[in-house]
UniProtKB/Swiss-Prot annotation:
One of its GO terms (molecular function) is acid phosphatase activity. Belongs to the HAD-like hydrolase superfamily. The keyword Nucleus applies. Keywords: Cytoplasm, Hydrolase, Magnesium, Metal-binding, Nucleus. It is found in: Cytoplasm; Nucleus. Its main location: cytoplasm. One of its GO terms (cellular component) is nucleus. This is HAD-like hydrolase superfamily protein P8B7.31. NCBIfam families: HAD-SF-IIIC, MDP-1.
Length: 172
C-alpha cells in the first residue's frame, strides 16, 4: 500500500504501448483466446501473445484500493478488439480472477482526438479535468492539457511507473 500520496480522482490510460506492448489494431489478429498457461495472456490467430506490461495489474489494483476512478482513452482503429481483449484477459482484481475490463469505469475507444474521449469521461463522471491524470505513449495526445488534465508521456518501454510519478507530482 502506498502512503503519503494524494491520489487524483481519475487516472486515464491509453492502451497501445501504455498498458500492453502492441497496437491492437495492427500487431495482432482476431480471434483471441486465453492462454492455457496464464489467464492474463491472450493468444491471437497466429500465436502472438497479448498481455499487460508486468507492473500494470499491481498498479491498477493499488489505484482501485485508493478509490481512484480508472478509465481508458484509446484512439485505436479496432475498438471492438480492444474491448474484446480487455474482456477475455483475466487478472487478479480484489483477490479473484476477473476480466481486466472490470478495472475501468469508462472505456472510450475509437479513432479520433483524445479531447473527445476526455469530454465524454468528464460529462459522464462529473470529475473535473484538473482531477484527471492521463498516461499515454504519444506526445501528440498532450493536447488534453488544454482541458486541465495532467498528462504524462510514458517513455520507458516496459514500465508505466505511475506510483513514482504520483509520489513526485501529487501533494501528500
Amino acid at each position: 500500500m502506498v502512503k503519503n500520496i494524494e491520489f487524483p480522482k481519475c487516472v486515464v490510460f491509453d492502451l497501445d504501448y501504455t498498458l500492453w506492448p502492441l497496437w491492437i489494431d495492427t500487431h495482432v489478429t482476431a480471434p483471441f483466446k486465453p492462454s492455457k498457461n496464464d489467464p492474463g495472456v491472450l493468444i491471437d490467430k497466429y500465436g502472438t501473445e497479448i498481455c499487460f506490461y508486468s507492473d500494470i495489474t499491481g498498479i491498477l489494483q493499488e489505484l482501485r484500493n485508493q478509490k481512484v476512478t480508472l478509465c481508458v482513452a484509446s484512439r485505436t482503429c479496432a475498438p471492438k478488439y480492444a474491448k474484446q481483449a480487455l474482456n477475455l484477459m483475466k487478472v487478479p482484481i480484489d483477490g479473484s480472477l476477473k476480466p481486466a475490463i472490470e478495472f475501468f469505469t469508462y472505456v472510450k475507444a475509437w479513432p479520433g482526438s483524445k479531447m473527445d474521449h476526455f469530454k465524454e469521461i468528464h460529462n459522464e463522471s462529473g470529475i473535473d479535468y484538473r482531477e484527471m491524470v492521463f498516461f499515454d505513449d504519444e506526445s501528440r495526445n498532450r493536447e488534453v492539457e488544454r482541458l486541465g488534465v495532467t498528462f504524462l508521456e510514458k517513455i520507458k518501454k516496459n514500465s508505466l511507473n505511475i506510483l513514482s510519478f504520483l509520489k513526485n507530482h501529487m501533494h501528500g
